[in-house]
């Protein structure tokens, strides 16, 4: 009787397992191990025969079944329901009606083809290197992005050494005046001494003006262009430091008041 109850419970357990698996093939029930379920040994043999089929068709449960290789490629799983998905399509729109997996795989393949068909060497034997056309990021939208250096002025090269000495001897404004002056008309070759004397006088006058300007710059700086540079004496310190003559009428007024008060008290 206990063995019969055990066989009935085993048969019931086997029936529940077979009903739980939706894709169980028919050969498992038609095998010789599952024909006679009266004994416990036959029941265990039938369960062993149907166990591989159950493990392949049913979801993976904790146990020895989870050690089997996955039927689908895990790389095909794409989180297309997130908007930051790199390979999926936005808003769940995919090619065909098979979900986001097919469109994601197709897009990934297109990116691999565009990248040069994988990291291996190309047909010409040259390995793909880093992108040379990629510009470095510069914060030009900030005013401190590109520090402005000192502007270099072009160096003027003169054909003869006389003009070089002249450029070193005179300041910039005098050189501009010399450059803007009209050229002298051609003179007779019989009077070269007059041209040399005129040039010597011009250079002497320019040197004298330059020395006078340097002496003027050496003096103390006066802020005459500001109204507080040198205020008049009668307006210094708010007008309190005035001469004694301006205070004479006030002293006379005080004396007259004192005399009047003394005269009234004497009466």
Swiss-Prot record:
Coiled coil: none annotated. Keywords: Acetylation, Amidation, Cleavage on pair of basic residues, Endorphin, Glycoprotein, Hormone, Secreted, Signal. GO terms for biological process: neuropeptide signaling pathway; regulation of corticosterone secretion. It comes from the Eukaryota. Glycans are attached at residue 91. Residues 94-105 have a biased composition (Gly residues). It holds the Pfam family NPP. One of its GO terms (molecular function) is hormone activity. The keyword Signal applies. Specific enzymatic cleavages at paired basic residues yield the different active peptides. Residues 109-133 form a propeptide. The modification Phenylalanine amide is found at residue 87. PANTHER family: PRO-OPIOMELANOCORTIN. This is Pro-opiomelanocortin. It comes from Sus scrofa. The lineage of its organism: Eukaryota, Metazoa, Chordata, Craniata, Vertebrata.
């Amino acid at each position: 009787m206990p063995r019969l109850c055990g066989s009935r419970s085993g048969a019931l357990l086997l029936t529940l397992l077979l009903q739980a698996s939706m894709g169980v093939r028919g050969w498992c029930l038609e095998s010789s191990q599952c024909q006679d379920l009266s004994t416990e040994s036959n029941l265990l043999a039938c369960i062993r025969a149907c166990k591989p089929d159950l493990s392949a068709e049913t979801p993976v449960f904790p146990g020895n079944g989870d050690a089997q290789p996955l039927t689908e490629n895990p790389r095909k799983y794409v989180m297309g329901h997130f908007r930051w998905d790199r390979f999926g399509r936005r808003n769940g729109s995919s090619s065909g009606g098979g979900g986001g997996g097919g469109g994601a795989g197709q897009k990934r393949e297109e990116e691999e083809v565009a990248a040069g068909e994988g990291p291996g060497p190309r047909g010409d034997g040259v390995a793909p290197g880093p992108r040379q056309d990629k510009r470095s990021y510069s914060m030009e939208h900030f005013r401190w992005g590109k520090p402005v250096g000192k502007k270099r002025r072009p160096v003027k090269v003169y054909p003869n050494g006389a003009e070089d000495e002249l450029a070193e001897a005179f300041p910039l404004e005098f050189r501009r005046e010399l450059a803007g002056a009209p050229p002298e008309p051609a003179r007779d070759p019989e009077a070269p001494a007059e041209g040399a004397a005129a040039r010597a006088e011009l250079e002497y006058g320019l040197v004298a003006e330059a020395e006078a300007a340097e002496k003027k710059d050496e003096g103390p700086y006066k802020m005459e262009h500001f109204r507080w540079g040198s205020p008049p004496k009668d307006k210094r310190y708010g007008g309190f430091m005035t001469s004694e003559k301006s205070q004479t009428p006030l002293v006379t007024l005080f004396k007259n008041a004192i005399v009047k008060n003394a005269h009234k008290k004497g009466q």
